[in-house]
Amino acid sequence: MSTIEQRANLNGKVAAIIGGASGIGEAVTMALAGAGVDVALCDIKSEALTPTRTAAEKLGRQVLAVAADATRSEQLAAFYAAVGARFDRLDIVVNVVGGVRRRDFMEATPEQCAGDIQRNYGYVIESVRHAVPLIRKGGRGGSIINFTTIEAHRGAAGFAVYAGAKAATTNFTRTMAVELGKDRIRLNTLAPDTTPSEGNMKALAPELLERMAGISPAAVKASMDMYIPMKAQPNPEDLANGVLFLASDLAAFVTGTTLHVDGGTMAAAGFIDWPYGDSYLPVPMDGTLKRLFDR
């Protein structure tokens, strides 16, 4: 019987990780390197490139690390040119870059909206356009994984353009899965919910951050965990494990779909496990209401 590593068939492949030096992207890079994948990564945070590159090299992998802003077309093109020059194959692409700052749509400037679209959808199109010829050149097929969000699948007040851009990425991914199926190039999205990270904290409105500053870290964590059925937020490694699956031959017949790595929040659809015995309901009941308002 073959081992799971043999069935995954990742050893010796090459991956490009867009936004691969910090946060979730770093976890993805290290997970792939740990599975025997040579990695090419770019990141706007140039100071994070060296430690991530060094850590991956210590695992015995070949590493290309490039400082680049993926939302700048010329920098993304230069990165892929470097990938093609360094490696004779490309098997896996992971588009991690994304992000937003919470704001009501009517308060956002056209420039802010355009930035949200480019950061969460526009560069993904360009990345796929650059990656496909390199994958085709190898003739082995490949896997492209685009990070999205639960907000691509529900209304998200305060994140209108972000949610719309991620939804566009989702349907673009589905469509390209159909177009590229004949090349055995699989495309899927990975949709997390809230993940503890510097980027997610920066996305919060300043006034909300100010209010939260007076609340204990334990209380903040409890409030974040309350609406997740598994009662915990994911680690970046949890998301990286989802990437490993989609990148590997274990998912050889999986394409055009979304893997929700969210602890069950998509399934819960707004039902929250309220405290004080109210259990799973979309609104608080007597146990919580009495403690909030009967004073």
Positions of PLM-derived features:
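Substrate-binding pocket helix/loop in short-chain dehydrogenase/reductase
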Residues: 104-117, 224
